[in-house]
Amino acid sequence: MAKQSMKAREVKRVKLADKFFAKRAELKTIISDVNASDEDRWDAVLKLQTLPRDSSPSRQRNRCRQTGRPHAFLRKFGLSRIKVREAAMRGEIPGLRKASW
């Protein structure tokens, strides 16, 4: 089980990313615009750097909903491999069963 503080930190990162999404997108379009002046582009770079680090979506980490485990996360289920296996063995995931060939 992950610490509660780690789970809370992830929630905070998601909220910050949502809050600053539009502003980051606007600044990135200015930076990538070849028709914009160098001064405008440089100002946009500086403004982008002043935004909180945790507002960047690349700092988010997928975590298991039940345990908070950051590794072996399966996006389809939103769970770690361990919890997916446990749920599958109990028959809680429709259509999922242990492979046999």
Swiss-Prot record:
GO cellular component: cytoplasm; small ribosomal subunit
Any GO MF annotation of the entry: rRNA binding
Keywords: Ribonucleoprotein, Ribosomal protein, RNA-binding, rRNA-binding
GO biological process, alphabetically ordered: translation
Coiled-coil stretches noted in the UniProt entry, renumbered to this chain: none
Top-level taxon in the UniProt lineage: Bacteria
Pfam families, A to Z: Ribosomal_S14 (PF00253)
SUPFAM superfamilies, A to Z: Glucocorticoid receptor-like (DNA-binding domain)
InterPro entries in the record: Ribosomal_uS14, Ribosomal_uS14_bac/plastid, Ribosomal_uS14_CS
Record-stated family: Belongs to the universal ribosomal protein uS14 family.
Quaternary structure and interacting proteins, as annotated: Part of the 30S ribosomal subunit. Contacts proteins S3 and S10.
The protein's role, per its UniProt record: Binds 16S rRNA, required for the assembly of 30S particles and may also be responsible for determining the conformation of the 16S rRNA at the A site.
NCBIfam families cross-referenced by the UniProt entry: PRK08881.1 (NF006477)
Protein's name in the database: Small ribosomal subunit protein uS14
Origin species: Sodalis glossinidius (strain morsitans)
Source organism phylogeny: Bacteria, Pseudomonadati, Pseudomonadota, Gammaproteobacteria, Enterobacterales
